[in-house]
């Protein structure tokens, strides 16, 4: 059914060992194949690499990187032996700064890895840390635990960060020239206790060439106060990425954000559209668990005596050609949103296209809505030519919110509970919210008038349509179902 309507909207990512980098990642959950639309980094074969050791009681002056005489800092080890495996032993370290000189190669990447069974923690404070470094430049205004600039063929694995204004930061700048920076990976890292800005962020400022083959996988970002920034964010000139298997929770702003059009990678001059490269694109966001994300208590969103509950679990803000699948999102202000916050009156590129959202489970989002798409007022850019299918939405206050959007398909979704099934923004023109919503199913909706018969079949009882999060209707709802451990976390958060 092709529809348009109006509703309500609340105003609102030495020993030797054999190293292998991961390649095309394919996951199958039931009938769901994730990542099949977007090409991932190819499998690389490396020669044996030298291990360089870093320890909190090491010494940068007299050490040589062996187990008997380790370096004291990651920065020294990476500068001395790029293209090696840097084994970081347990202990406390000060902030780390890495640059292009620390790059590896396709055959011999620089790998910064926690020693097996040990817990190295990088602290984002100015205090002296035995064996570590003191913060460089910026003091309280800029306390980054681990910063990487213009390096490529580099992987950070199993490192923890604590505190600071930023946890792990990667940036590309124009100093890198017109060659893409590729094969950047952040894996199995833990970021906690950020006070100020980002947990993990990749900012691609270089408009001349993209960051590509970016992987953020298996990380945990928690207990972060992000202000008006995000828990995990990628932004700017990024072409080809994978965000997978991360756990993002208990933070006071957006969980995972994929951004375009903020001016990071604008062309300074010339005939090209200045925003041509300033957009995250061609990526996959899958198998992440995002929960307890809310701007409640975040002063950046306090106005007129109340907090604007507008923190998304997963947000595409100006990105394009992205697949979002098999994620479990719960207890967020907004579960999953696809939009742009910029107006096409300012630039014709300001719209969101080519996003497919499928086989996700979104539950218990009480701030506003489970799934939302479109610019939030009448002048913002369209979400268009996107597809939202085979998702299961459970007990979200509003299940689906439609804003400025057109030519999108919403089908094969299962909506269970909630007060409102589908809500249309009162701040957008009716003719600017024309999409196809059909072939879905719903049960136990509080306001049954919010369900048009053209949307699909309405059932009176949730037991007829699902067993927990598992759909009982063939071809409807998510093929991905959270395991019992995740369901237990959800149930506890809902208490």
What are the functions of these language-model segments?
Residues 44, 61, 84, 105-107, ...:
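Acidic, glycine- and Ser/Thr-rich low-complexity intrinsically disordered tracts
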Residues 115-119, 152-163, 179-195, 210-225, ...:
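Right-handed parallel beta-helix
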Residues 30-33:
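C-terminal motif of bacterial Sec signal peptides marking the signal peptidase cleavage site
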Residues 11-24:
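Sec-dependent N-terminal signal peptides
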Residues 1-11:
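N-terminal secretory signal peptides that target proteins for export/translocation
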Residues 95, 143-145, 167-169, 197-201, ...:
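Structural detector of coil-to-beta-strand junctions
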Residues 56-97, 105, 142-144, 470-475, ...:
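Acidic Gly/Asp/Thr-rich repetitive segments characteristic of extracellular carbohydrate-active
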Residues 56, 68-71, 103-166, 193-195:
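Right-handed parallel beta-helix/beta-spiral solenoid domain characteristic of secreted/periplasmic
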